[in-house]
Design a protein with these regions (language model features):
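Bacterial signal peptide processing site
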Residues: 22-24
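Conserved C-terminal helix/tail region of periplasmic/extracytoplasmic solute-binding proteins
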Residues: 297, 301-324
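Pocket-lining segment of extracytoplasmic ligand-binding domains
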Residues: 89-91, 169-262
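Short, glycine-/small- and polar/acidic-enriched structural segments
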Residues: 26-154, 160-164, 180, 186, ...
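Bacterial N-terminal signal peptides that target proteins for export
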Residues: 1-9
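C-terminal motif of bacterial Sec signal peptides marking the signal peptidase cleavage site
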Residues: 17-20
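Secondary-structure end/capping motifs
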Residues: 231-306
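Short, solvent-exposed loop/beta-turn-alpha elements that line the ligand-binding surface or hinge
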Residues: 53-60, 206-217, 284-292
Length: 324
């Protein structure tokens, strides 16, 4: 009888232990992943992924945040609050140099800026003596424009540059002919063409950059960065996430109307009617980091020669590139 009681007690203890283990497993919380991206082409590129918010890997809960201003995005990254972010390519370098805790994992968009004019010009060489409007003095669109101008045999002093804070400010300027020539990105370019159908799209900065540098892709405009300490322990998730980003971009390019609907639902500021018309020239493309290391190195070298502060004080070393 005693033996039987002992056996029952042992069995009860074992069951209790197993139940305890099971409860602990059940109570294990999902890993929360914060993905931050700016309002504009990067959030358009990830719109399918953000709208569906699909389960990328069991045990992870992904939160997508669209930052409405560049300052908000910069603050989020520099405070290391984002596990994954899509940022301007120069901000990727700054984040690495300043925090040592972010790595470049891929590209979601190449150069989407265009030289447009109400005047009859054929290219960058024809800009001598003209006034050209652009966004952000000393920022990457300005530096890239000046690099292309110099490569076309002109001095930046040959051109009278005027600057505005955002691409949205360029649209009324050109549409009302307060400025006749400008460097305009998508999707603002599509909005401009609706207001001024006669505007001439003269050159793509990305295509011009490709010719000058002999690059296969052009210059990286939007970059996916991942937090290093998060990547170290969650590599499988990140690799799966990058595959989903690629699929999202393919879908967006192939289904502009649906992409416009998704963007509206996730809070992208651009109207869906503008989005679906802008995708043809938006240059959204996923390029894995292993395919674009040379492009980043070359672009950072160009930026550093104009203003080393634009990339955080120095060209990042090899550790900036994420390894799968």
């Amino acid at each position: 009888m005693k033996k039987r009681i002992i056996k029952i007690l042992i069995l009860a203890i074992c069951i209790a232990c197993l139940s305890g283990c099971s409860s602990k497993e059940d109570l294990k919380e999902d890993i929360s992943v914060k993905v931050s991206m700016p309002d504009g082409l990067p959030s358009i590129a990830l719109s399918k992924l953000a709208f569906e918010n699909k389960n990328i890997k069991d045990g992870y809960n992904v939160n997508y945040n669209i930052e409405k201003t560049p300052d908000n995005l910069s603050t989020t990254v520099m405070k290391e609050e984002a596990d994954i972010a899509v940022v301007p390519s120069n901000m990727a370098a700054i984040a690495y140099n300043k925090t040592k805790n972010y790595e470049i994992a891929g590209t979601t968009g190449l150069g989407s800026f265009y030289l447009v004019s109400n005047d009859d010009i054929g290219g960058f060489k024809d800009l001598k003596g003209k006034e050209v409007a652009n966004t952000g003095k000393g920022l990457t669109p300005d530096i890239t424009t000046k690099f292309i101008i110099k490569s076309n045999g002109l001095n930046e002093k040959d051109i009278n540059f005027t600057y505005v804070n955002s691409a949205n400010e360029l649209v009324p300027m050109i549409a009302s002919e307060k400025a006749n020539t400008a460097i305009v990105p998508e999707p603002a370019l599509t909005a401009l063409k609706i207001k001024n159908p006669e505007i001439k799209v003269v050159k793509s900065l990305n295509e011009e950059y490709k010719k000058i540098t002999k690059s296969d892709y052009g210059y990286p405009q939007a970059t996916i960065i991942v937090k290093s300490d998060f990547a170290k322990n969650n590599k499988e998730f990140i690799n799966l996430f990058l595959e989903e980003v690629k699929e999202s971009i393919i879908f967006v390019n192939s289904n502009p109307d649906k992409a416009g609907e998704y963007c509206e639902k996730i809070g992208v500021g651009t109207k869906k009617e503008i989005i679906n018309k802008s995708l043809e020239n938006a240059n959204l493309q996923f390029i894995g980091v292993e395919e674009s290391i040379k492009d980043y190195k070359d672009y950072y070298k160009i930026l550093s020669e104009y203003d080393i502060k634009s990339i955080g004080g120095k060209i990042p070393d090899e550790k900036v590139f994420y390894k799968k």
